[in-house]
Amino acid sequence: MLLLPFQLLAVLFPGGNSEHAFQGPTSFHVIQTSSFTNSTWAQTQGSGWLDDLQIHGWDSDSGTAIFLKPWSKGNFSDKEVAELEEIFRVYIFGFAREVQDFAGDFQMKYPFEIQGIAGCELHSGGAIVSFLRGALGGLDFLSVKNASCVPSPEGGSRAQKFCALIIQYQGIMETVRILLYETCPRYLLGVLNAGKADLQRQVKPEAWLSSGPSPGPGRLQLVCHVSGFYPKPVWVMWMRGEQEQQGTQLGDILPNANWTWYLRATLDVADGEAAGLSCRVKHSSLEGQDIILYWRNPTSIGSIVLAIIVPSLLLLLCLALWYMRRRSYQNIP
């Protein structure tokens, strides 16, 4: 665990209250997915994330990082970035080779997939906690705590055997320790500061209502769409007056291409119960001015046609009467 210097806390949390002043991401992590088809073919994908926002990719062909934002390097120099890229290149190549070499010893049956996540998180009060977890086929396999390999119960004897093997490689464990407990915290602070304008921006949501597929005879599905908001935390609820409707179903918060978010909230009701319902949206960007949209039964196509045709016919009738009356006056000698 690392404690932030006071000066950096003041930059990230200018209001003095870290729990409320900083509403952007608070963690950085890299994700590795390695797929092993057979003893000679493997593919690894990598990416870097601030919470749910991707800021790095990995080009497997060139073995270089892809920086998705101008500030994705944080405060690291080009030399430091090049050194890290070299570490990851060597690691990815060596990891695939070692796994294939030891697959038989660990009774690994092709094809299989290994996932890994490693990073660090800024906690309230300024502490930074680092983490590393590995999974095999979607099941927890091991973690690193206090620079030691800890097998997961789901990994069984295979995970225990792996940890016993890896701790013999002191050079690898020292590199992991440096990356987790020194490099990652320093990078996290730098990138949060470098990307501060983007990460702490406030973008107001847009909201609209629609009807979804009918859930059954005599019933309606009301849908409240909320899109384009940032940061991610949002509160959406179907209401009747001030009473929350407990049947409200929230979907997953999904990313838009422009680093904003989308959410939909649905409510199934009987035909006669939709009147008086509203969708309420709360978000930090609204500064307490909640969005409230009231449900109105959609107008039928027939009503729309009548609303257009009837006035048009009346207008034509008036014009015809005016024209006939004008002609009749002209025929008077």
Swiss-Prot record:
Q: Provide any one GO MF term from the record.
A: endogenous lipid antigen binding
Q: Which InterPro entries match?
A: Ig-like_dom, Ig-like_dom_sf, Ig-like_fold, Ig_C1-set, MHC_class-I_related, MHC_I-like_Ag-recog, MHC_I-like_Ag-recog_sf, MHC_I/II-like_Ag-recog
Spell out which residues lie on the membrane's Cytoplasmic side.
325-333
* Positions annotated with a glycan in the UniProt record: N38, N75, N146, N258
Record's signal peptide: 1-17
Expressing tissues: Expressed on cortical thymocytes, on certain T-cell leukemias, and in various other tissues.
Please tell me whether the keyword 4Fe-4S is annotated for this protein. no
Q: List the disulfide bonds.
A: C120-C184, C149-C163, C224-C279
Keywords assigned? Adaptive immunity, Cell membrane, Disulfide bond, Endosome, Glycoprotein, Immunity, Immunoglobulin domain, Lysosome, Membrane, Signal, Transmembrane, Transmembrane helix
One Pfam match, by short name? MHC_I_3
Residue interval(s) of motif Internalization signal: 329-332
Its subcellular locations are: Cell membrane; Endosome membrane; Lysosome membrane
User: What are the residue boundaries of the Ig-like domain, all occurrences included?
Assistant: 185-295
Read off the PANTHER family from this record.
MHC CLASS I-RELATED, T-CELL SURFACE GLYCOPROTEIN CD1B
Q: Anything further noted?
A: During protein synthesis and maturation, CD1 family members bind endogenous lipids that are replaced by lipid or glycolipid antigens when the proteins are internalized and pass through endosomes or lysosomes, before trafficking back to the cell surface. Interaction with saposin C is required for the loading of bacterial lipid antigens onto CD1B in the lysosome.
Job description of the protein: Antigen-presenting protein that binds self and non-self lipid and glycolipid antigens and presents them to T-cell receptors on natural killer T-cells.
Q: What is this protein called?
A: T-cell surface glycoprotein CD1b
Q: Species name for this entry?
A: Homo sapiens
Q: What is the lineage of its organism?
A: Eukaryota, Metazoa, Chordata, Craniata, Vertebrata
